[in-house]
Amino acid sequence: MLSVRIPLAPITNPQQLQLSPLKGLSLVDKENTPPALSGARVLASKTARRIFQEPAEPKTKAAAPGVEDEPLLRENPRRFVIFPIEYHDIWQMYKKAEASFWTAEEVDLSKDIQHWESLKPEERYFISHVLAFFAASDGIVNENLVERFSQEVQITEARCFYGFQIAMENIHSEMYSLLIDTYIKDPKEREFLFNAIETMPCVEKKADWALRWIGDKEATYGERVVAFAAVEGIFFSGSFASIFWLKKRGLMPGLTFSNELISRDEGLHCDFACLMFKHLVHKPSEERVREIIINAVRVEQEFLTEALPVKLIGMNCTLMKQYIEFVADRLMLELGFSKVFRVENPFDFMENISLEGKTNFFEKRVGEYQRMGVMSSPTENSFTLDADF
């Protein structure tokens, strides 16, 4: 039976035109839109609103000096398609991140409660405050990735990595929030820890340091890459070491295992920042990089030796200061510059764990997790009948 097409009735009511889902739809400020086309942003967090003071009337800004000379930042009309791969080293970093995907549900916290209750009050105080810092800091890293880096960088391989990093930072933040939720039973104390950026001056100081870099309209991409390499490579290093110290004592297996997973991820994120820095044509001077790194070291040393001293869990504050300097030197080397502090690693238990640039977690496969087949070449998974036996 032939179908009969009924002609559309003419539109007599002008209001019917407003029913179209495309009416008034703007493609500005959507995913993969270059920053120059972005409209007014609705900022997700109070801290971001505090940093970003956008003008009431948007003004057309000229491209930042050097953007057209930077292959990473130059507008790329092929950014919507992944293949063919142009930056193979950046793509391999993305595949490493993809191979190491994990979720908070994989971490067993059942034994931690008994350990937590047996800890001294000062040890519980230290751990809870470190977790509060971690829970907030991953959100700040994501604020930077969403607001700045993902919009500025135009090469597809790096955008893939940043997208996956955002997902992993969300998992880290969920893991830390879950740890606080598991250990802290008092609702008021729990709320205090979840709002650490506003309730703890020591955490607020570190957060403000990072947030200032997100909101700095004058700083170059290269300077901000160094700053956030410092956030993930220096600001996290001392706290990671303090939790690994608990592992050395045989305490808190769930906390320490999640710390292994997260520190491995952050090591990779730090390595990626260094790789992006190496791809820049116009890099900040060594003097400027040293200034940023030294400033980050001072903030972290104050955090773990004065504001929240590691002596609360039995660690030596002087050695912790030295360890932070050691990590900073490794970061300077990975960025292609000379060491600043020239000190040895004072913590033997961190020898294979420190965020040293060339992450050795993939060789050691910490926690025995890596997605099967993700790092394999296509030919490795093919079936043949002519193999040698």
Curated annotation (Swiss-Prot):
Motif (Cy): 49-51
UniProt modified residues of type Phosphoserine: S20
Residues bearing PTM Phosphothreonine: T33
Localisation per UniProt entry: Cytoplasm; Nucleus
Positions bound to Fe cation 2: E169, E232, E266, H269
GO CC terms of this entry: cytosol; nucleus
Post-translational modifications: Phosphorylation on Ser-20 relieves the inhibitory effect on Wnt signaling. Phosphorylated on Thr-33 by CDK1 and CDK2; predominantly in G2 and M phase.
Example of a GO biological process term: deoxyribonucleotide biosynthetic process
Cofactor(s) the protein needs: Fe cation
A Pfam family recorded for this sequence: Ribonuc_red_sm
Keywords (A to Z) from UniProt: Cytoplasm, Deoxyribonucleotide synthesis, Iron, Metal-binding, Nucleus, Oxidoreductase, Phosphoprotein, Ubl conjugation
S-adenosyl-L-methionine is among the record's keywords: no
Active site: Y176
InterPro entries named among the record's database cross-references: Ferritin-like_SF (IPR009078), RNR-like (IPR012348), RNR_small (IPR033909), RNR_small_AS (IPR030475), RNR_small_fam (IPR000358)
Classification via PROSITE patterns: RIBORED_SMALL
Binding-site residues, Fe cation 1: D138, E169, H172
Cofactor binding note from Swiss-Prot or TrEMBL: Binds 2 iron ions per subunit.
Family in the record: Belongs to the ribonucleoside diphosphate reductase small chain family.
Protein purpose: Provides the precursors necessary for DNA synthesis. Catalyzes the biosynthesis of deoxyribonucleotides from the corresponding ribonucleotides. Inhibits Wnt signaling.
Subunit record text: Heterodimer of a large and a small subunit. Interacts (via Cy motif and when phosphorylated at Thr-33) with CCNF; the interaction occurs exclusively in G2 and early M.
Further comment found in the protein's record: Two distinct regulatory sites have been defined: the specificity site, which controls substrate specificity, and the activity site which regulates overall catalytic activity. A substrate-binding catalytic site, located on M1, is formed only in the presence of the second subunit M2.
Protein name: Ribonucleoside-diphosphate reductase subunit M2
Organism: Macaca fascicularis (Crab-eating macaque)
